[in-house]
A protein has these predicted regions:
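Active-site-proximal beta-strand elements of phosphoester/diester hydrolases
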Residues: 77-90, 208-222, 258-261
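Acidic, histidine-bearing metal-coordination/catalytic regions of metal-dependent phosphoesterases
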Residues: 1-118, 136-152, 164-202, 254
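Active-site neighborhood of phospho(di)ester-bond hydrolases with catalytic His/Asp-centered motifs
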Residues: 82-84, 117-124, 128, 150-156, ...
Length: 282
């Protein structure tokens, strides 16, 4: 690991090598999905890690620095990437993921007024159970050439666990919700440091834009962000209350986005928890 000043942020490697074409799999998916613990808890939500700050708000300037943010403001516009389900589900998956990551990295032209300001990952970064040993192959290595901050909200695959010894979202929190930027073991010899989001759900404040990112828990389907009147006591209502508060605070601002995983559905209406939260602020 190269020497570097403490608390300094690093994004891309200056001379990234060739893309991976495959990675080793320690356990088969069947071994996870057939575990008694996973089957027993298949229809249960898991506790949501508490945010480190209240309210959980992160300013882009805190990550990028004053100079870069001023460049964005002076340009009068902001460009960014947003993509979900980037994890490589199979050992040959890095090929497909690398094509997408490389295409985004190629959009950096050294022009502050048009270069992407950040990448926002919309969940399911790591398949199949968010294990820390796959963060190198499914996150750090594919995005080693991306020359900007990367923020993320977790998806169900990032949080689901297969045994009572696995802590939900532990690896995600370590790599994206660190108290200060450090070089995580999962990054290997790559330069990117951990992100310092205040929590797994938070608001990213950027010039011309605010993104309210939510964590929809581990169930398949539209997700859960509240207790639903006591049906999911492990979840509680903190996240829904946060969403309501942020929608009210940001009501007068242009460019406010609420993001969660899954990001869209082809059929059916929004579920009551989200519909109610979005309607209360008016």
């Amino acid at each position: 690991m190269p020497d570097r000043p403490a608390d300094k942020r690093y994004f891309a490697d200056p001379a990234p090598g060739a893309d991976e074409t495959r990675f080793s799999v320690d356990n088969s998916s069947a071994q996870y999905y057939d575990s008694p613990y996973y089957k027993l808890h298949l229809s249960q939500v898991l506790e949501v890690p508490k945010p480190r700050t209240h309210p959980p708000i992160l300013k882009l300037e805190h990550v990028w620095g004053h100079e870069r943010v001023q460049q964005i403001i002076q340009s009068g516009q902001i460009a960014f990437h947003a993509v979900g389900d980037t994890g490589a589900a199979r050992h040959t998956g890095p090929i497909t993921e690398a094509h997408v990551a490389d295409a985004m990295a190629a959009e950096f032209k050294g022009k502050p007024d048009s270069d992407p300001a950040f990448l926002y990952l919309l969940g399911d970064l790591i398949y199949n159970f968010g294990e820390d040993q796959y963060y190198y192959d499914q996150f750090y290595e594919p995005f080693r050439a991306y020359r900007a901050p990367i923020f993320a909200i977790p998806g169900n695959h990032d949080g689901v666990v297969y045994s009572d010894k696995a802590q939900s979202l532990a690896a995600f929190v370590k790599n994206f919700c660190a108290e200060k930027p450090v070089h995580p073991v999962e990054a290997g010899n790559l330069l990117r440091t951990s992100m310092t989001q205040p929590g797994v759900y938070f608001t990213l404040e950027a010039p011309f834009l605010s993104i309210v990112g939510l964590y929809s828990n581990v169930l398949e389907g539209p997700g859960v962000i509240s207790s639903k009147n006591g049906r999911f006591p492990k979840v509680g209502d903190d996240q829904k209350t946060f969403l309501e508060s942020e929608l009210k605070r940001l009501k007068a601002k242009r460019g406010s986005i609420a993001a969660m995983h899954p990001t869209a559905r082809r059929r059916g209406a929004a579920r009551p928890a989200r519909r109610g939260a979005c309607s209360r602020p008016g």
